[in-house]
Design a protein with these regions (language model features):
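Alpha-helical membrane insertion/targeting regions
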Residues: 6-7, 12-202
Length: 202
């Protein structure tokens, strides 16, 4: 067996053994209470966002202020999508440290987006898509999937990070396989929704 392949195999076995040992140690403390708190907090956050979208009415005094926020939101979503793809690349190549940094960066971009999103909707309210016909149906379909999956993504992202930061790597890998595509889809469709609104704004 070639030496590089042998070394890589030993490294893989060492990582798997470490994950197993850590998993046994962490198994003594149930993650259910923390996951329960994450679900409750996520539910409260989603409830607030739904209120902001469909109940809150923006003041006309702020209608023309900070008009750059929608573009900033799309930019942050795009950066998040890039960071997610880079993180996937690194973990596929067994570079755990670079993967961790990339995913933390993606989380930072998503957090910044959420803050900017709340400020934008507080000041400006919801934006109505002016298009008609099939393009409106397409837009609403993308928007609906974006909103629904963003609701699902919030607790999943937090739970995935919790498992990683507490050393529960087996559970982290298991849930990350579901979290990643949802998070990536939400980030990409956030940009797509902005492009639709911008293209039909005039």
């Amino acid at each position: 067996m070639p030496l590089p392949l042998l070394l890589r195999t030993r490294n893989d076995l060492r990582m798997e053994f470490y994950d197993l040992i850590v998993g046994v140690e962490q198994a003594e403390t149930s993650p259910r209470p923390v996951v329960g708190v994450i679900v409750v907090v996520s539910g409260l956050a989603v409830s607030f966002l739904l209120w902001l979208l469909y109940v809150h009415h923006a003041s006309a005094d702020f209608a023309q202020r900070w008009m750059f926020l929608p573009a900033l939101n799309a930019f942050l979503n795009g950066l998040c999508a890039i960071a997610l793809c880079v993180g996937l690349y690194f973990i596929k190549h067994r570079n755990k440290e670079a993967h961790r940094k990339s995913m933390l960066l993606a989380f930072a971009f998503s957090s910044a987006f959420l803050i900017s999103y709340i400020v934008n909707h507080t000041l400006h309210g919801d934006t109505i898509f002016p298009g008609h016909g099939p393009v409106r149906t397409l837009y609403l379909s993308i928007l609906a999937s974006h909103i629904i999956l963003s609701i699902v993504a919030l607790p999943m992202v937090l739970t995935t990070f919790f498992f990683s930061l507490t050393g529960r790597f087996a559970m982290h890998r298991l849930i990350a396989r579901v979290t990643f595509p949802i998070w990536l889809y939400v980030s990409i469709t956030g940009v797509v929704v902005f492009v639709f609104l911008k293209a039909y704004a005039y």
